[in-house]
Amino acid sequence: WEKDFAQEIADDRMKIVSIHTVFEGHRHQSLSRLKKFVKATGFGHSVGHDRHDVSDEYPNTMILYGTRGTPEVAIIDKEGLIAYQRIGFFDVEEKTQMIRDLMAA
């Protein structure tokens, strides 16, 4: 979507954010490994590392947004409400049109 919406991102009308949520294998999936991965893949958007308090079963973002696993995508509208959320496969072309429709609204 970074390429499809390059102008909207440049005009600060759209943001793409990834959140690395670790719900197992915490020692292996560290913040330092994430930073290396992001640098190696050349992501052009912000990537956050989900905070996990040892007293909680799940990381903070999973608790706050009710995410269930990876990969999971959420499209958040102009009011900050979740317009679409899905775990696993989704139709990219269909969701690209959905984003265009939300931006036009």
Which residues make up each language-model segment?
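A general secondary-structure boundary signal
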Residues: 6, 31, 45-46, 72, ...
